[in-house]
């Protein structure tokens, strides 16, 4: 049950990932063989629930890449269910301050360190109580990544970084750019300056910085600055653009698409 993704971040080894939004175990397994270090199963903006997350975790399990799951909100009940089906690494969205970061950590820990309910006899995570001492080992293998996506969260970053149990901080460029007044333009110089400053600050604190960016040049720039988990594409975008390109080669006209962060 060792969390190799958490170990890689702790060792300072950059991890390259892909975002999964198709909500399909079939496509998740297909992409698990592509060679990425981690795959993000999105429960915030993709039509996922606990059952579809479970089937994708099962599909990815035979492969070396590590799944990361994003719940729809920083909700301890939802987090408990996601952990019980086997999630070890969580990306918690829209964390605004240290208190909210602390709540996210507590939701992943069994008492007395946290508030995670004990139901290991029913849980895939414990292999239905077949993992010896699961209740004693589970806390140490949980990896908590919190998402900062607003100016308020950026202002509170030093306090968020001080929260014990937060393994990494993920910068959400789409929401951050919107909050800064540049919706749809995460490459605006002011947004980029804020992102770069945050990456350096997070890395210097000893935590792992992360981001999603489909722009190859920017992805490499963030890695140079010290980002440790970088998602470089989204399955829905890859499929849509590849299909449009194929159709265009035979004269078809696709609906115009404005390039974005994804």
Swiss-Prot record:
The keyword Ligase does not apply. Its cofactor is a divalent metal cation. Substrate binds at residues 147, 174-175. InterPro entries: Aldolase/citrate-lyase_domain, HKHD_aldolase_ent, HpaI, HpcH-HpaI_aldolase, Pyrv/PenolPyrv_kinase-like_dom, Pyrv_kinase-like_dom_sf. The active site is at 45 (proton acceptor). It holds the Pfam family HpcH_HpaI. GO terms for molecular function: 4-hydroxy-2-ketopimelate aldolase activity; metal ion binding. The record marks 84 as: Increases basicity of active site His. Keywords: Aromatic hydrocarbons catabolism, Lyase, Metal-binding. Pathway: Aromatic compound metabolism; 4-hydroxyphenylacetate degradation; pyruvate and succinate semialdehyde from 4-hydroxyphenylacetate: step 7/7. SUPFAM superfamilies: Phosphoenolpyruvate/pyruvate domain. GO terms for biological process: 4-hydroxyphenylacetate catabolic process; phenylacetate catabolic process. One of its GO terms (cellular component) is cytoplasm. Its EC number is 4.1.2.52. Binds 1 divalent metal cation per subunit. The record marks 70 as: Transition state stabilizer. Catalyzes the reversible retro-aldol cleavage of 4-hydroxy-2-ketoheptane-1,7-dioate (HKHD) to pyruvate and succinic semialdehyde. Homohexamer; trimer of dimers. Belongs to the HpcH/HpaI aldolase family. This is 4-hydroxy-2-oxo-heptane-1,7-dioate aldolase. It comes from Shigella boydii serotype 18 (strain CDC 3083-94 / BS512).
């Amino acid at each position: 049950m060792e969390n190799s993704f958490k170990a890689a971040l702790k060792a300072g080894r950059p991890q390259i990932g892909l975002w999964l939004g198709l909500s399909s175990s079939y496509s998740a397994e297909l992409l698990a063989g592509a060679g990425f270090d981690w795959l993000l199963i999105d429960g915030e903006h993709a039509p996922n629930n606990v059952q579809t997350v479970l089937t994708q975790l099962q599909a990815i399990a035979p492969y070396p890449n590590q799944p990361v799951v994003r719940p729809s909100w920083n909700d301890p009940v939802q987090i408990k269910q996601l952990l019980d089906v086997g999630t070890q690494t969580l990306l918690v969205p829209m964390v605004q301050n240290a208190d909210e970061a602390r709540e996210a950590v507590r939701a992943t820990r069994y008492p007395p360190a946290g508030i995670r309910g004990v139901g290991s006899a029913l849980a895939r995570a414990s292999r239905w109580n077949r993992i010896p001492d699961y209740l004693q080992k589970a806390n140490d293998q949980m990896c908590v990544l919190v998402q900062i996506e607003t100016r308020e969260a950026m202002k509170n970053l030093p306090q968020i970084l001080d929260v014990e149990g937060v393994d990494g901080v993920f910068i959400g460029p789409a929401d951050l750019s919107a909050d800064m007044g540049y919706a749809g333009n995460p490459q605006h110089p002011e947004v980029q300056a804020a992102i770069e400053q945050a990456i350096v600050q997070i890395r210097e604190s000893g935590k792992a910085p992360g981001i999603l960016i489909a722009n190859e040049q920017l992805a490499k720039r963030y890695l140079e600055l010290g980002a440790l988990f970088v998602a470089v594409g989204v399955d829905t975008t890859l499929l849509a653009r590849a299909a449009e390109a194929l159709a265009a080669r035979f004269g078809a006209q696709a609906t115009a698409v404005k390039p974005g962060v994804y």
